[in-house]
A protein has these predicted regions:
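Mixed-charge, low-complexity intrinsically disordered regions
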Residues: 1-88, 93-98, 121, 128, ...
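Beta-strand/loop nucleic-acid-binding surfaces
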Residues: 108-122
Length: 204
């Protein structure tokens, strides 16, 4: 997948960064969430965003161009990557003995049991966050990027998602990025009531 970030595709990465940060808020290398946002960007670039000249995301193009060279195991792995779940989730708790995290996709309403017990202490029941899930061998795993939203804005986030649940994927992604921008503004204007930040008529 490195080929889609270098050489002839390097200018495309630059354009994609502008698009992503225009929609989700520009981060600087000294921002607390810089590494998280860069991880979210790379996943979005590789798995969600269509490269105009190709008419598809890099992962889809890579599979189509190289599928005859893949083993069955590699085909399954790449197909799972192409069908990753990028969404806003709510943390519901853990399974017995805390071996898996239970999260619910707020768009599809589906629940997933995620294999990553190391993260269990990073979550509190009711946490709302943007993340990406990958499936491998029938198990779900988180990608590296997260964007946690203030729990005080639960009703706002739930209501906005409810409005567009049955719209297309592009509209879902647009809202996910808009919420990420609101979170970034909330961090930068921490002295302002979050209710004045999370909204489409916000002055901030």
């Amino acid at each position: 997948m490195e080929i889609y970030t270098t050489g002839e595709f390097y200018p495309e990465v630059f354009k994609a960064k502008q698009e992503f940060f225009d929609q989700s808020g520009t981060v600087h290398d000294d921002d607390v969430e810089f590494e998280q946002r860069m991880s979210l960007f790379m996943d979005w670039y590789l798995f969600d965003r269509q490269i105009p000249s190709l008419g598809m995301p890099p992962i889809t193009h890579y599979i189509r161009q190289n599928q005859i060279d893949f083993s069955e195991e590699e085909k399954q792995l790449l197909d799972n990557l192409a069908h990753s779940i990028h969404s806003v989730f709510v943390f519901k708790g853990t399974t017995i003995f805390g071996k898996k995290l239970v999260v619910q996709d707020l768009f599809s309403k589906k629940k997933y049991k995620v294999v990553d017990p190391r993260l269990s202490q990073a979550f509190a029941r009711g946490d709302i966050f943007e993340a990406r899930l990958f499936q491998h061998d029938g198990k779900f795993f988180f990608s590296q990027g997260f964007c946690f939203h203030p729990v005080e804005m639960k009703s706002f986030i739930f209501n906005e998602i409810k409005k567009i649940r049955f719209q297309d994927r592009e509209r879902h992604l647009q809202l996910i990025l808009q919420l990420a921008q609101m979170k970034l503004k909330h961090q930068r204007f921490a002295h302002i009531d979050v209710k004045h930040i999370y909204g489409f008529d916000s002055k901030f």
